[in-house]
């Protein structure tokens, strides 16, 4: 299929961040926000080389004058032109490779619309002339990265969360559950509850500030009610944060109220089960014989599982739902932010995987629908 000296590319294009690298790497080479920014003001200085759009970190650094848009929402691409810009930026500016020379492994959330992966396939072959490509399910790659073949992965990124039970390397599609509640919803919720405190964040650029507050200061309480009482009676939980203009804001119970929405989606007005219940429901959809192995191998993955305290809280909540004697183990690897990308790197460098690629030739014969036959 392809020579050994040509490394495959692994691109984990998430709703919030793109993680990209080469097969065989133990960490992504490029990590940048999946953002396309367009100027919201008229350019007046000649010779500045102003562009009509900026991608990734450059958009982030000029956010004060740009309108920032994420081309992916809830794991589904909503703007293909912008997505193409992001891929172009990934290949040419971040990884500095010619896409027509390397096979590329892309990732996607389970239970995504079929049209989404077809279009991904089409763009890779027709716009970038990839020699071969493959679309893998994110959670499955996370399990590879944790060195297991059996377990249930709870993967939560910026756009979508899902639980995928995997037994001896087989994903169990009937038991996969998807929850459209993830990092971006938490950021929006934090924006809302900070407004109640008298701090107003409204623009797309200010949302990025709130995301930073969330990532630096939020944590999951082991006992939410008790934590609320502690916060009300003392200022021990308060932390201050300096905004880019030097103004300092104080945040208290918002620190744990924000990620609490993962366990109580009703906070966001969502009528769905929390992440602990979703995990439990997913396990209960599996065969009774394998549940024990799933309970003992619950793997967390993705950026929205990076909150301190989330593993202990998951342990507590799932223990309360599961049968009393069941051994429950939550695995939260420190590199779980990038475990999808790392898993992709492992998968793409396996010798047994080389016959799994969709080649340009197969694509030319069958069209975009080949992706459903070749990729799980």
UniProtKB/Swiss-Prot annotation:
The modification N-acetylaspartate is found at residue 3. Keywords: Acetylation, ATP-binding, Cytoplasm, Cytoskeleton, Hydrolase, Nucleotide-binding. One of its GO terms (cellular component) is cytoskeleton. PROSITE patterns: ACTINS_1, ACTINS_2, ACTINS_ACT_LIKE. It is found in: Cytoplasm; Cytoplasm, Cytoskeleton. It comes from the Eukaryota. GO terms for molecular function: ATP binding; hydrolase activity. The keyword Ligase does not apply. Signal peptide: none annotated. Belongs to the actin family. This is Actin, cytoskeletal 1B. It comes from Strongylocentrotus purpuratus. The gene is CYIB.
